[in-house]
């Protein structure tokens, strides 16, 4: 029996030793690609309303529905303030994400050392795109706004004034300093795949006489410019560096988009992924749903929600066409809006409709007038004597402007936190309450570009 007991003791000791030995942590997988989706102005109330709107369009009550990115594994709340502003603008918020540094309102990728009106290049911080290109990655930029607008411009440019989209926008100080406008900066940025609006800033409307679209095409045999959806579709999916500008200014809202002239945000995203993935170098792609913000500024909930749903569809397409082991996908907003969901409507009440009680009767305010579930704290459609004539058909129309509490020419941004949704390698860093500047570190660390240690 003794030999057997000795063997058992040895085995037991060996097992205990194995259990107490340190276990090597499995290294976290590095992302080959990162896609940053930014819903401009897509605050949490917008996500909620769009969720219900999309669900109701599919025959549900709506409240139980989920948009594509709401299924992601990781979630955080993001502080959005600018260096000098409690309620931010898109220039400051996009700069925070792209550089990890807060800027003053109205500035793109510059520090407080550059006053408005200067070039902004004396203190331009390093951008994600700079680090990515230095590491051999490709760069893609997609927006339904002008490609020189604040959010897309922050991927490739810097400006002490976000209004420097064209050389005609430069003030006397900027001209004297020899500043370069954002459209010209894009052409020299070495970006690989760029689609959006804003063609007017690249040719005929310029004082310097430059045709920047022709300059893009002249960069190499592989550089191509297109100006409508059919031209884009006729291009080979891979092998080209593409600049596509489909409208003079911003692209159309999704509710009025002509598919023969303008590709959808999903189609633009799909084409970008096909092109960038084929390079096999890895890529950083920023996709902006830029018109959500514009609809909110006009208190037009219908267009804000239809553009948000289109944006969510683009995210779903990206999830379905990328490798989840290699691609980090982030979805966030740059800021929120003073957009509310209120009034105790019954479950399943049309989100664009008048508030109805559980008994089906229309709710009335203290003056005996009906009111909508969706509204704005401020904006152009101040409540007036005509409110008692509102009907469900009127308020559900795509041109209806929601009621606002404070009369302003344009509705404003809001200062509350926005959400950040994440999936893929590196997404575990997205949790809790974070500053917007930390998105820079999430991306660069996932790609192995820098360390925040």
Where are these regions (language model features)?
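Bacterial N-terminal signal peptides that target proteins for export
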Residues: 1-8
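Extracytoplasmic mature domains of secreted/periplasmic and thylakoid-lumen proteins
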Residues: 101-183, 190
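A post-motif C-terminal structural segment
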Residues: 31-33, 42-95, 148-453
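Structural beta-sheet core signal
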Residues: 36-37, 141, 331
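C-terminal motif of bacterial Sec signal peptides marking the signal peptidase cleavage site
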Residues: 17-18
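Active-site-adjacent structural elements in enzyme catalytic domains
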Residues: 29-36, 41, 45-46, 51, ...
């Amino acid at each position: 029996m003794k030999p057997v007991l000795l063997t058992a003791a040895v085995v037991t000791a060996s097992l205990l030793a194995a259990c107490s030995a340190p276990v090597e942590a499995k290294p976290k997988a590095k992302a080959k690609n990162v896609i940053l989706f930014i819903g401009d102005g897509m605050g949490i109330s917008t996500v909620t309303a769009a969720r219900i709107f999309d669900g109701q369009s599919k025959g549900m009550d709506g409240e139980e529905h989920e948009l594509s990115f709401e299924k992601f594994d990781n979630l955080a709340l993001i502080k959005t303030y600018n260096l000098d502003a409690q309620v931010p603008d898109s220039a400051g918020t996009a700069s925070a994400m792209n550089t990890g540094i807060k800027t003053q309102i109205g500035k793109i990728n510059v520090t407080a050392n550059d006053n408005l009106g200067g070039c902004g290049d004396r203190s331009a911080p390093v951008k994600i795109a700079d680090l990515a290109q230095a590491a051999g990655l490709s760069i893609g930029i997609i927006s339904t706004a002008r490609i020189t607008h604040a959010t897309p411009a922050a991927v490739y440019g810097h400006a002490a004034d976000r209004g420097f989209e064209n050389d005609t926008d430069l003030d006397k100080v900027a001209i004297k300093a020899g500043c370069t406008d954002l459209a010209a900066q894009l052409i020299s940025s070495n970006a690989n795949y760029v689609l959006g609006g804003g063609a007017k800033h690249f040719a005929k409307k310029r004082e310097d006489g430059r045709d920047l679209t022709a300059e893009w095409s002249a960069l190499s045999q592989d550089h191509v410019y297109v100006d409508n959806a059919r031209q884009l579709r006729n291009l080979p999916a891979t092998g080209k560096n593409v600049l596509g500008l489909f409208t003079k200014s911003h692209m159309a809202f999704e509710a009025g988009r002509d598919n023969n002239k303008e590709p959808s945000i999903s189609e633009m995203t799909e084409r970008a992924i096909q092109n960038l993935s084929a390079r096999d170098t890895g890529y950083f792609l920023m996709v902006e749903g830029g018109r959500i913000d514009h609809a909110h500024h006009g208190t037009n909930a219908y267009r804000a929600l239809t553009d948000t749903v289109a944006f969510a569809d683009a995210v779903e397409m990206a999830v379905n066409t990328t490798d989840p082991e290699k691609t980090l996908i982030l979805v966030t907003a740059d800021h929120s809006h003073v957009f509310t969901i209120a009034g105790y409507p019954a479950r399943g009440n049309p989100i664009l409709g008048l508030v109805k009680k559980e008994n089906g009767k229309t709710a009335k305010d203290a003056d005996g007038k009906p009111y909508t579930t969706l509204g704005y704290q401020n904006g152009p459609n101040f409540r007036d004597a005509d409110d008692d004539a509102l009907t469900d058909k009127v308020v559900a129309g795509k041109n209806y402007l929601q009621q606002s509490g404070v009369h302003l020419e344009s509705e404003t941004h809001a200062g509350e936190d926005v959400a950040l949704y994440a999936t893929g390698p590196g997404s575990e860093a997205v949790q809790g309450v974070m500053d917007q500047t930390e998105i820079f570190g999430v991306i660069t660390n996932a790609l192995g570009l820098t360390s925040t240690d």
